[in-house]
């Protein structure tokens, strides 16, 4: 059942509710754009169970020691609150500069979106993360329920970046962050005190640790496939 506006205002953070009105790119299973849909529409399991699918990205930032920057999502987040995840996970919007019908156009769009959201969530200025240094690797199609009425059903573009960044955390988006080595992340996965987003665990289980071993040559892992997970 879709919750009433009055109930939402009582239960959820005002800023996070506002962001639920942003317009995502609804796609088919081949990542062909069909129309726009609000973030709220795209994340309701009622719609996901009918096949609604949207475009997303997952950014992984590594420092000069090849440590991965993780974030813990804020308690205020409507979907997957307080879970640990990769550096930044969000969506290109159905706006100029972030749309894309062909794969090269779509990759450029998600890079623009990633730069926008890295600033919004982590306060990373564009000068530290030039888009021409973003490495697109592949796309992953997955579905995962969250709590209550919410979930994810995405074609997720994977982006890598290696470099030094300065952070200015937005507490409405992120409650904590840390840099980890591959072994430290594996230890976190086995520690029950940590909870993780399903897409991050899925990416790590199927792809991430192989990519991480050769992060300086990540371009060799690039493909044009959509991996169904």
UniProtKB/Swiss-Prot annotation:
A Gene Ontology cellular-component term: cytoplasm
Annotated EC: 5.3.3.2
Pathway: Isoprenoid biosynthesis; dimethylallyl diphosphate biosynthesis; dimethylallyl diphosphate from isopentenyl diphosphate: step 1/1
Superkingdom as given in the UniProt entry: Eukaryota
Main location: cytoplasm
Keyword list, A-Z: Cytoplasm, Isomerase, Isoprene biosynthesis, Lipid biosynthesis, Lipid metabolism, Magnesium, Metal-binding, Nucleus, Steroid biosynthesis, Steroid metabolism, Sterol biosynthesis, Sterol metabolism
Location within or outside the cell: Cytoplasm; Nucleus
Requisite cofactors: Mg(2+)
One Pfam family here: NUDIX
Catalysed reactions, semicolon-separated: isopentenyl diphosphate = dimethylallyl diphosphate
Keyword match Cytoplasm: yes
Binding residues annotated for substrate, in chain numbering: 39, 72, 77, 90
BP terms from Gene Ontology: dimethylallyl diphosphate biosynthetic process; farnesyl diphosphate biosynthetic process, mevalonate pathway; isopentenyl diphosphate biosynthetic process; sterol biosynthetic process
Keyword presence, Cytoplasm: yes
MF terms (GO), sorted A to Z: isopentenyl-diphosphate delta-isomerase activity; metal ion binding
Residues that, per the record, bind Mg(2+): 43, 54, 152, 154
Database matches in SUPFAM superfamilies: Nudix
NCBIfam families for this protein: IPP_isom_1
Family membership noted in the UniProt record: Belongs to the IPP isomerase type 1 family.
Name the record gives this protein: Isopentenyl-diphosphate delta-isomerase
Species per Swiss-Prot/TrEMBL record: Schizosaccharomyces pombe (strain 972 / ATCC 24843) (Fission yeast)
Lineage: Eukaryota, Fungi, Dikarya, Ascomycota, Taphrinomycotina
């Amino acid at each position: 059942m879709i919750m009433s506006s009055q109930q939402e205002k009582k239960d959820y953070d005002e800023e996070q509710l506002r962001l639920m009105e942003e317009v995502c790119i609804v796609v088919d299973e081949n990542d062909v754009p069909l129309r726009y849909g609000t973030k709220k529409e795209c994340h309701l399991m009622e719609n996901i169970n009918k096949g609604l699918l949207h475009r997303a990205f997952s950014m992984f930032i590594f420092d000069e020691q090849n440590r991965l920057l993780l974030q813990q999502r804020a308690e205020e987040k409507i979907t997957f609150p307080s879970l640990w995840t990769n550096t930044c996970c969000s969506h290109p919007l159905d706006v100029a500069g972030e749309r894309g019908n062909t794969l090269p156009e779509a990759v450029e769009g998600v890079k623009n979106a990633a730069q926008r959201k890295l600033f919004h969530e982590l306060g990373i200025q564009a000068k530290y993360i030039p888009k021409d240094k973003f490495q697109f690797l592949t796309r992953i199609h997955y579905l995962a329920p969250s709590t209550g009425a919410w979930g994810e059903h995405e074609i997720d573009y994977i982006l890598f970046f290696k470099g030094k960044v300065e952070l200015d955390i937005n507490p409405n988006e992120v409650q904590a962050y840390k840099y980890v080595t591959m072994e430290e992340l594996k230890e976190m996965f086995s520690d029950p005190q940590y909870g993780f987003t399903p897409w991050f665990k899925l990416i790590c289980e199927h792809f991430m640790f192989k990519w991480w071993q050769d992060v300086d040559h990540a371009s060799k892992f690039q493909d044009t496939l959509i991996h169904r997970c």
